């Protein structure tokens, strides 16, 4: 397999630009004929014109005349083109129904959809398919009216008509220049849900959501989420929508979550369709977040886009930050923040510590699809959040305004964004640039002491070596800090000439001491409040100090962090006891702290999240020679101990939560709202503990299942809690669930995820059986993710000592890679942990990776990842 590596340092501006793109799609059966007419502007006259493409080429003309060309390795090269502006016409043929990669133009459910980011447009026609070539598009679509009554593309509809043979046509015009990755087309038999939004300047924007007729009743929440996002972006950022219409199309076969194509967003059905019987509260929150994210891209991604794909985080990190802020304003801000940090630690921290570690702005890539990563998105959002922490809301908004003033309508870089933030605030952010170029999660080791009426806090930063770079420079790291006395009361201190209760300490050196003055009593530092930087922080807290932080810190994130540290220590104590064959410890400090959590006055959503232990991945994050089963057993033992210790309290909290839900009006009792969602989350946490502590309770669940499962949040909570039970009751209830929702594709995804995440002895066998379930298709990304990626995260079964879990996932990676490399590449990342495993498992996993690597015709997507794992030192 030949490798082409692309390097950031090799960037060169395009030799040609495309001022105008006129597309004509003639949708036939089975082929679609695509004609493009491009107005091309030479930037460096004399150089050959090179276009990207993999479609079947029918003809090429320059200024109306056929020309000679060379077509090789998906590059179309035309020499001797005019030195002044000229017209290039290209005709191609594509077969959407045969396109199983779901990139370019493809068929799903009898309809046609596109996905062009990052390099799907070249599957449709030949083009300068890179984000810094921005063009104004018009698109004409011709198709059979009965088969394809709906014909959509970007921008505003400007013309249309019918032919005598039963075919019809529509012409769309996008008045804003855009790169090819933002092109979209949809053709099919779809139902529309309409609404309107009036912008802050008084313009009336039409909103259209397209789904199947059956799914039409499930789009209401997504429509309201869009209107809320449009209003929020005006209020928070002063950004107004710029077209006459905003369209969203939902499709069940989709590689990603959603795509922000200008004026015509295409969404995975998972992030559009919901009602309380089929979607959990978490699903509703996901819809709100993703709808917001894609809408916010209209300015941060579309109006200002990326110069090249190395700059992907310019649009994605910034837009994730914006959607996180939107979600934080819609519900409990601290709970949403904790959710974001948990995801970062669960997925991005391991990525930063593994063979595929890369900076927020990668320096090189083989396959661009592989860089739609947690690092680029979630760590990228944390980088943007650090600007906000350093500059404050006012300073951040000044930077955003300057960014748009300078760059509206341009394709720019992460450095351009940093320059806007720095220049708008008169601050030097040169050192901050290292967040874009250095991979790895910084580790902060802190020590504190009381000296001469001040608290001295010394912080040492270490950035671990990563495959791309061994030696790292000290970074600019904001550490939001407060102090508590031994009774838990906030202590004021002097910093930079002010008397404050909280300060942002900016670490810029490898080791630095901060002096917090006017402190005359023993204090407990509350560090990295609100997770002010994406780092790992170590401080030698005593268990009593952690208990004080959990009980009394004014910063709720810091309270949660203290609980996580107590859990972490308890799990590790269990590991030690299990390894030495000793009885498990009683964990008095943790149990005393949890007694406060279960009995104190807490917001229900916050209480529920305090009860969630760190995952196994969190526990072993900084370790080598990992035995996953040992960590899993230690964590399970702690869960069981907590369940038994507080069984009466779980029952009482469950009763209180049910009472709160029942007090709501019957019409909305089981619908989504942030308040009721908090009570339901707490109730599901209590149910899980009750079922752990009281084995007989499953019979009560079986007898009262219908009464208890009043919406999907309850039903999912119950099934998750009994999912690892070996009794026939679990099988019976899961089968009943599948029968009830057999015709709902998204709920069946939940069913397959339950099967794959069970800890029962027969889980692998049940997963293999599910592959042949009539509602399962391995070609559907949602189904593949729900069953296979869920299984790859099942610690005891994926890491089974006999290697059966590794072998099974390797087989599926190779199978999927033949038709959808993008999904296969996501699945193969389960093997990223290989070189951190203990010797036996490492050897078994390495053998499976070598087997994948030897597969004939292995895609670049999978080959790049496997190669990095096998070559990791």
Spans of model-derived segments:
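N-terminal, polar/Ser/Thr-rich
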Residues: 1-33, 106-115, 127, 131, ...
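Short, hydrophobic/aromatic-enriched beta-strand segments in well-ordered soluble domains
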Residues: 35-40, 53, 84-99, 137-145, ...
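Surface-exposed beta-strand/loop patches in extracellular or lumenal glycoproteins
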Residues: 37-56, 127-129, 135-144, 415, ...
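A surface-exposed beta-strand-loop module
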Residues: 43-45, 52-108, 129, 164-165, ...
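Extended, low-hydrophobicity, Ser/Thr/Pro/Gly-biased non-transmembrane segments
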Residues: 91-194, 219-221, 432, 556-559
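Long, ordered, helix-rich scaffold segments
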Residues: 373-374, 515-873
């Amino acid at each position: 397999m030949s490798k082409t590596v692309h390097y950031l340092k090799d960037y060169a501006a395009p030799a040609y630009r495309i001022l105008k793109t006129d597309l004509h799609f003639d949708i036939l059966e089975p082929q679609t004929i695509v004609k493009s007419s491009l107005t091309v502007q030479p930037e460096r006259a004399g150089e050959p014109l090179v276009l990207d493409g993999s479609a079947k080429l029918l003809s090429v003309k320059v200024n109306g005349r056929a020309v000679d060309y060379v077509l090789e390795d998906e590059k179309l090269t035309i020499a001797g083109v005019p030195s002044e502006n000229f017209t290039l016409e290209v005709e191609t043929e594509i077969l959407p129904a045969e396109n199983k990669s779901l990139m370019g133009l493809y068929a799903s459910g009898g309809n046609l959809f596109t996905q062009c980011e990052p390099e799907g447009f070249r599957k449709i026609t030949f083009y300068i398919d890179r984000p810094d070539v921005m063009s104004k598009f018009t698109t004409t679509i011709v198709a059979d009216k009965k088969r394809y009554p709906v014909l959509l593309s970007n921008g505003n509809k400007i013309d249309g008509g019918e032919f005598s043979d039963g075919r019809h046509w529509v012409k769309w015009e996008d008045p804003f220049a855009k790169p090819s990755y933002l092109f979209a087309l949809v053709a099919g038999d779809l139902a529309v849900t309409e609404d309107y939004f009036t912008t802050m300047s008084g313009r009336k924007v039409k909103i259209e959501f397209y789904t199947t007729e059956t799914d039409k009743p499930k789009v209401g929440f997504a429509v309201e989420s869009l209107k809320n996002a449009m209003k929020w972006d005006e209020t928070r950022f002063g950004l107004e929508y710029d077209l006459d219409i905003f369209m969203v199309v939902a499709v069940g076969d989709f590689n990603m979550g959603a795509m922000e194509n200008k004026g015509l967003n295409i969404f995975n059905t998972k992030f559009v369709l919901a009602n309380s019987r089929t979607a959990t509260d978490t699903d509703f929150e996901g819809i709100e977040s993703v709808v917001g994210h894609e809408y916010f891209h209209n300015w941060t991604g579309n109006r200002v886009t990326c110069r090249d794909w190395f700059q992907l985080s310019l649009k994605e990190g910034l837009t994730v930050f914006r959607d996180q802020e939107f979600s934080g304003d819609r519900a409990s801000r601290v709970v949403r923040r904790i959710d974001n940090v948990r995801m970062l630690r669960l997925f991005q921290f391991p990525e930063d510590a593994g063979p595929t570690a890369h900076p927020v702005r990668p320096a090189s890539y083989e396959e661009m699809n592989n860089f739609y990563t947690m690092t680029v998105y979630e760590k990228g959002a944390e980088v943007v959040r650090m600007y906000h922490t350093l500059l404050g809301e006012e300073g951040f908004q000044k930077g955003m305004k300057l960014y748009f003033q300078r760059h509206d309508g341009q394709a720019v870089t992460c450095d351009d964004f940093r320059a806007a933030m720095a220049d708008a605030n008169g601050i030097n952010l040169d050192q901050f640039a290292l967040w874009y170029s250095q991979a790895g999660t910084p580790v902060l080791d802190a020590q504190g002491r009381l000296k001469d009426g001040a608290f001295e806090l010394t912080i040492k930063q270490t950035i671990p070596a990563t495959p791309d770079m061994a030696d790292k420079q000290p970074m600019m790291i904001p550490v939001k800090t407060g102090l508590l006395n031994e009774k838990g009361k906030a202590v004021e201190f002097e910093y930079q000439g002010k008397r404050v209760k909280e300060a942002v300490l900016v670490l810029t050196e490898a080791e630095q001491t901060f002096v917090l003055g006017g402190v005359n009593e023993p204090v407990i530092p509350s560090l990295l409040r609100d997770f002010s930087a994406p780092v790992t922080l170590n401080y030698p807290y005593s268990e009593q100090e952690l208990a004080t932080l959990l009980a009394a810190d004014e910063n709720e994130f810091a309270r949660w962090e203290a609980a996580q540290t107590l859990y972490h220590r308890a799990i590790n104590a269990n590991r030690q006891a299990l390894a030495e064959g000793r009885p498990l410890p009683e964990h008095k400090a943790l149990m005393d702290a949890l007694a406060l959590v279960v009995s104190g006055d807490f917001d229900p959503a916050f209480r529920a999240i305090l009860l969630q232990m760190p995952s196994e991945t969190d526990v072993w994050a900084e370790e080598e020679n990992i035995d996953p089963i040992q960590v899993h057993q230690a964590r399970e033992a702690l869960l069981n101990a907590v369940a038994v210790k507080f069984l009466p309290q779980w029952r009482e909290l469950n009763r209180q939560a049910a009472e709160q839900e029942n007090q709501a009006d019957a019409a909305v009792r089981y619908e989504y709202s942030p308040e009721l969602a908090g009570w339901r989350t707490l109730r599901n946490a209590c149910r899980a503990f009750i079922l752990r502590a009281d084995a007989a309770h499953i019979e009560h669940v079986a007898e009262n299942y219908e009464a208890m499962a009043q919406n999907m949040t309850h039903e999912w909570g119950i099934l998750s809690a009994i999912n690892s039970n070996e009794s026939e009751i679990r099988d019976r209830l899961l089968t009943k669930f599948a029968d009830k929702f057999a015709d709902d594709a998204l709920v069946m995804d939940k069913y397959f995820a339950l099967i794959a995440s069970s800890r029962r002895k027969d889980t692998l066998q049940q997963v293999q059986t599910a592959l042949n379930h009539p509602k399962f298709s391995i070609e559907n990304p949602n189904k593949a993710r729900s069953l296979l990626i869920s299984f790859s995260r099942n610690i005891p079964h994926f890491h089974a000592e006999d290697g059966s879990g590794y072998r099974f996932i390797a087989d599926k990676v190779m199978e999927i890679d033949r038709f959808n490399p993008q999904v296969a590449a996501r699945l193969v990342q389960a093997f990223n942990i290989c070189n951190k495993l203990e010797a036996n498992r490492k050897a078994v996993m390495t053998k499976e990776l070598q087997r994948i690597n030897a597969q004939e015709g292995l895609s670049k997507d999978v080959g790049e990842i496997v190669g990095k794992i096998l070559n990791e030192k």
